[in-house]
Every structure is written in structure tokens, then in C-alpha cells.
Amino acid sequence: MKISELMEVLNNHVPFHQAESWDNVGLLIGNDKLDITGILTTLDCTDDVVNQAIELNTNTIIAHHPLIFKGVKRIVEDGYGSIIRKLIQNNINLIALHTNLDVNPKGVNRMLADQIGLENISMINTNSSYYYKVQTFIPKNYIEDFKDSLNELGLAKEGNYEYCFFESEGKGQFKPVGDASPYIGKLDSIEYVDEIKLEFMIKGNELEITKRAILDNHPYETPVFDFIKMNKESEYGLGIIGQLNQTMTLDEFSEYAKKQLNIPSVRYTGQHDSPIKKVAIIGGSGIGFEYKASQLGADVFVTGDIKHHDALDAKIQNVNLLDINHYSEYVMKEGLKELLEKWLFKYENQFPIYASEINTDPFKYK
């Protein structure tokens, strides 16, 4: 399998367009024409992680946090530059799945929820998205070639299904006049053609490529086509809310979460004996959603990187917070490995997939 094929699989399951506009996801370093020798999943791409990839003869690293995020002004033999140089010198590809993995229904937040053992899970902040229903009219004899052209561009796909079209037959008519150069018919003569009305769905960001595909592949000089905008509730969204199988006190839950996530420390705001049954989680840095989680009935909001004033505000407003540190997202290493094994199972010439055991938490705890 080549990197380009892997990128297509990833885009099908963890769409890159679902990432936040400020994010930097996808193939950050590498060559999409290279064959994959192995994949190593990691939270952060550090020098130690790159060394591990070299030792494992693995030429592809998939990290949650982008190595190239802020503007890189120079690549020298220190800091991030040394990591980038080592990746390039050893022909190692670096792929980032960040906020697009955060909002995925099987992504980081679901992995954290599963680790804690939440049940009856739903999303905190479901996104709404738009798409288009496309309809155009094709002479019957050209319909299959036209559909093939659209499919080659990745259009008319729904999840794991290709060639998602609906056809209905009819009869079209036209009369070429003036300087017309008809593909079918003669000047100044009404032509009747057996046509197929072809309908299919596209994502919101596929409008321009679809328009160009129709104009380039339709046999008519001036094809008729419509784009009908439609809205739907997305299956993607940020954060998970679910229930514990039994009620605990806030103090008990903090110890339980620490143990389940295997992290060195936690801290919380709120009364130690507050009853906890319904739990909301946003991995990484999720402050800003704690009040929505509370409105949804969460007894505690679990996240990382909680600042003093945010914690104080929540405490004053009786919103319980549990800080599990940003590094708790490390659960994605094994979680993503399992997802990749499922997504790539049907492909031949398999390669090993590893979850890095290297701890990239920059903090030491006492």
C-alpha cells in the first residue's frame, strides 16, 4: 500500500475537512508515492518516537498532535528542526490526525469514555453540516462512461459505498441553431434523445470539483445540471457524555478516573462528596464546553489544561471539573492502532502497525 492509498482510507474514516480551520492535519512530511513498511501511532512526534520508528523499520508515523503547527521559519540541527531533518533523512512519512480525530464518533473522546467505562454515550456538541443533491441529464448511451468519470474523482460516495446514483428515464429535446456545434443532432432540426436523469449526493466542499467534472465529461456543449443545498445533522461532534454504571462521589470518581486512565495525577473542583453519575469528557483542552455539559445534565466535566480562573469560575457556579491533564489523550495510540487494523484489514500486502510505548508527557510528577 502506498501513502496516497492510506491517505484516502484515512480521509474516508477521519475526514480531513472535519478538522478546525486553524489546524494542520494530513501528510505533513513525506512522499505519497512511497510504499508503506509499517505504521507507528503516537500522541506526539518526538526525537525518541522517530528513533523508535527507525528501529522498527517503520516508515510512517501517525501522530495526534501536529509537529508542524505554527509557522516554521527555519529547519536547523536543533529543536523541532532536528526532528524534521531526521524524518526527511530517513524517508519517514509523518501524518497528523488532530481535531478531525477529536470530533470523530470513534475518536479520542470516545476512547477516553471507553477507558473510563461510560455507557449510554452521546455527543456534547453535534455539528450540523450541509451537502448537495446533484441532478443532471445524460444521453442514455453515455451514462456509464459519465458515472465512471465521476467515480474516479471520488464523487457519489457514501461511506464505504461507491457509485451511489439514482437514475430515471425520460426524453429530452433540443434544436441547435446559429453557431451551435452539437455533439448529437443537426443545425435547425429538433432532436429527440433518450436521456437519463442522474441524481447523486456530494459533500459541501465538493461543489466546484463536481461542476467541473460535469462540464468536462458531459457530451453536451451546455449541459443542464442543478445543485440543491440540503442540511443534515452530522455524525461528527466534539465531546462525549455518558453514564457510569454506578454513582460515585466526586472524590471517588477522581481516583477511579486516575486509575482507569493510568495517569499520575488529577485535580478537581467541587464538593468531594458530590454524587457523580453522568460524565462529560473532552480530551486535551476542552474548557469552554463545561457549562453546556452541565446544561445537558453532566455531574462533572472532564478535560485537561484547566486554568486557575476557569476553575474558580466553575467552582463559584457549582460546575464540577476534573482535570486529567492533556497527556491523557495518549489513549489514542492504542485506540488508533485498533481502528487502523480494522480499516486496513481488507488490503493485501499488509504491514505491521505499532502503538508507540514512549511517554511524551513533558511533565514530571511528584
From Swiss-Prot:
GO cellular component: cytoplasm
UniProt entry keywords in alphabetical sequence: Metal-binding
Gene3D superfamilies according to UniProt: 3.30.70.120, NIF3 (NGG1p interacting factor 3)-like
Source organism (scientific name): Staphylococcus epidermidis (strain ATCC 12228 / FDA PCI 1200)
Top-level taxon of the source organism: Bacteria
Chain sites annotated for binding a divalent metal cation 1: H64, D102, E329
Lineage per the UniProt record: Bacteria, Bacillati, Bacillota, Bacilli, Bacillales
Molecular function via GO: metal ion binding
Oligomeric and partner information: Homohexamer.
Protein name in the entry: GTP cyclohydrolase 1 type 2 homolog
Similarity annotation: Belongs to the GTP cyclohydrolase I type 2/NIF3 family.
Binding site for a divalent metal cation 2: H65, H326, E329
InterPro entries, per database record: DUF34/NIF3, DUF34/NIF3_bac, DUF34/NIF3_sf, N-reg_PII/ATP_PRibTrfase_C
Pfam families in UniProt: DUF34_NIF3 (PF01784)
PANTHER family, sorted: GTP CYCLOHYDROLASE 1 TYPE 2 HOMOLOG (PTHR13799:SF14), NGG1 INTERACTING FACTOR 3 (PTHR13799)
SUPFAM superfamilies associated with the record: NIF3 (NGG1p interacting factor 3)-like
